[in-house]
Amino acid sequence: MYVIDPIADMLTRIRNANNARHEVVDIPASKMKKAIAQILLEEGFIKEYEIIDDGKNGIIRIKLKYGPNKERAITGLKRISKPGRRVYAGKDELPKVLGGLGIAIISTSKGIMTDKKARKEGVGGEVLCYIW
């Protein structure tokens, strides 16, 4: 299956699995999706992820994180920069999501990172998505 916007597809799969309170979600793998999954892990939005070899690019299996009463760790995900309308932010214009409670994932010349790390590194880039 050909997907026009693979990152939006990844976010939608996570959102749907999260809303249905599934434990795991499988996503076709790519380097960018692996980097996003790593950021989600580091920021505490998911339990863990693993790469499963399927003979092609592989599959990322993400284990979603919930609280003791099935409260979601991820409240919302929003794609910002889309194939039809790219959104860029300079180092001084990097967004703060919900006043710092959420994260923005930025694709910079130094790799994919959170808005907080991009501010620290002093780089701007393409604003991929918001997660809170």
Curated annotation (Swiss-Prot):
Name of a matching Pfam family: Ribosomal_S8
Keywords, in A-Z order: Ribonucleoprotein, Ribosomal protein, RNA-binding, rRNA-binding
Tagged with keyword Flavoprotein: no
GO-annotated molecular function: rRNA binding; structural constituent of ribosome
One GO location term (cellular component): ribonucleoprotein complex
GO terms, biological process: translation
Cited function: One of the primary rRNA binding proteins, it binds directly to 16S rRNA central domain where it helps coordinate assembly of the platform of the 30S subunit.
Entry's family note: Belongs to the universal ribosomal protein uS8 family.
Subunit text: Part of the 30S ribosomal subunit. Contacts proteins S5 and S12.
HAMAP family linked: Ribosomal_uS8_B
Protein name: Small ribosomal subunit protein uS8
Species per Swiss-Prot/TrEMBL record: Caldicellulosiruptor saccharolyticus (strain ATCC 43494 / DSM 8903 / Tp8T 6331)
Gene that this polypeptide is encoded by: rpsH
